[in-house]
C-alpha cells in the first residue's frame, strides 16, 4: 500500500512516477514500523511524521557508492532526530553504470550502528528493543519541543 513519497527528480524518476501522498504503518512482532523508500531519506519531515507512531523506520534504497557517506550519515541523523531505530537496506553490486556498496545497517535511537553488513551482499540481523525507544522518549521528550505550526508557517512564507 505504500508509495514512495519523493520520486528522485535528479534521476528522472519524477518524469515517470508520481509521488505518494501518505505513509503506511504496520506492526512486526509488536513493534510499530514505517517503511520508506530510498530518496525519502533526504526529507526529515516525513520521518518526523512517521515517528509519532513508529519505533522502527525502514528505508529500502538504491544508494550508489559515490553517495555512501550521505547514506550512512542521514540514517544516523534520522535515528537521532526521531529517537527510534532505523533499518537501512541498500542495494549492492552494479547496474545501470553505477556501483552500489550495500552498507545495510540497523541504527539504535541514540545513533549507534548496532548491526552492519560489510560491503556486498550480507544478511543483517539485530535485536530491536521497543522499550528502549519508549524509555528514551520519556527521559528526553524531544517531540514536546517541536513547533509544527511554526514550521508550517515558515514553509508558507517560501511560496
Where are these regions (language model features)?
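Active-site catalytic loop in hydrolytic enzyme cores
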Residues: 1-52, 66-73, 100, 135-142
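C-terminal beta-strand edge segments of enzyme domains
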Residues: 7, 25, 91-159
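CN hydrolase (nitrilase-like) catalytic-core segments centered on the catalytic cysteine
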Residues: 42-124
